[in-house]
Amino acid sequence: MGIGMDSSTMSGPLVAHSGILDGDYEKRPAVCKMQMRFDLANVGLRVLSLACSLVALVSMASNQESGVVTVFGFKLPVYSKWSYSDSFEFLVGASAAAAAHSLLQLLLCGMKMVKRASTIPSRNHAWLLFAGDQVFAYGMLAAASAAAGVTNLNRTGFRHSDLPNFCKPLHRFCDKAAISIVFAFISSLILGGSAVLDVFWLSKN
């Protein structure tokens, strides 16, 4: 007497997971395609986040300039440096931390893809990534907002005198600060996108 068994009704440890957790690409080509798209999106966001964080970091950490301004007929030397502002120091620190986070996750993703495994091996890992991406996203947003909202740059940026418009004699300093702030905002958005991608993965597993 033959006994028939419907594999679709089976449950337990012998049944393959229906989500995208498993990295067994050869046996499940449909899952492979979806998994590959997710992994490429994950790696792409990590690369962009790393690049933007590094631009924000380098632009600000190398930002200093000296010049001469004329006040009431007197020429006064002025000098500005990023470390004179607490907000700029915060931005440098946040950018360095975000860059380190992005680099670490990028390396881990690369190692997983070389082994043809999912870049997120478990739900616990996904939750950890989600928390980390959120922390760094809000950190970069706060740092960029603080740097953009600085109103007391005359005191922190000048050694010799208070001037109402220090960007006129030190335009290069202001331009580099603006570049750093813009890329910090972009990095924050990208890290937020990574957090959304983490949620997508969790919803599928």
Swiss-Prot record:
Domain of life: Eukaryota
Extracellular side: 61-89, 147-176
Topological relation to the membrane, as annotated: Multi-pass membrane protein
Statement: the UniProt record of this protein carries the keyword Secreted: no
Subunit-level organization: Homodimer and heterodimers.
Stated name of the protein: CASP-like protein 3A1
Similarity remark: Belongs to the Casparian strip membrane proteins (CASP) family.
PANTHER family: CASP-LIKE PROTEIN 3A1 (PTHR33573:SF48), CASP-LIKE PROTEIN 4A4 (PTHR33573)
Short name of any one Pfam family annotated for the protein: CASP_dom
Entry's Gene Ontology cellular component terms: plasma membrane
Statement: the UniProt record of this protein carries the keyword Disulfide bond: no
Residue ranges that the UniProt entry lists as topological domain Cytoplasmic: 1-39, 111-125, 198-205
InterPro entries attached to this UniProt entry: CASP/CASPL (IPR006459), CASP_dom (IPR006702)
Location(s) in or outside the cell: Cell membrane
Transmembrane segments: 40-60, 90-110, 126-146, 177-197
Glycan attachment points: N154
Keywords annotated in UniProt: Cell membrane, Glycoprotein, Membrane, Transmembrane, Transmembrane helix
